Amino acid sequence: MTGKDDVFLEEARLGPRSQVLVDCEEVPNIPRLVRRFREYLLTDLAHAVMLTETDILTGARGPKLLAGLLEIFDADGDGFPWLAQSGSFLVQVEHRLGQRIGEDIAGLLRAGPSRNDQSAAAERLFLRDLLLSDSIYIGSNISFETD
């Protein structure tokens, strides 16, 4: 029997993930998540700010949630403890927050957006930044010759 700290939300609800799924789907997806770490955390931070400013999170809960997210953000993607068996970034961050600030507050981050919402927003931010950096690079390497 595992302790409560060892069980992810999905595992408690659906049972353990198939090792084939973990090896063939989740492990290869980790580099993609690492590349988009900043964007995923920015969507979480923006959502936490909204929850706090609209008083959905009252008292010390909002500031505590924001502090936990900022701590994870500062760890950067390479320092984050990626766990392939947990699956999505959303579940991984919620698990890490639960360890840091308590499950009761960590679970409040999911009041509203779905995984699809978060993934779409993070992907748009990632691609926007990629296009902007490529445009700046191209623009700085254009030279105009006059005859």
Question: At which residue positions do the language-model features occur?
Answer:
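A helix-coil-helix interface module used to build multimeric assemblies
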Residues: M1-D147
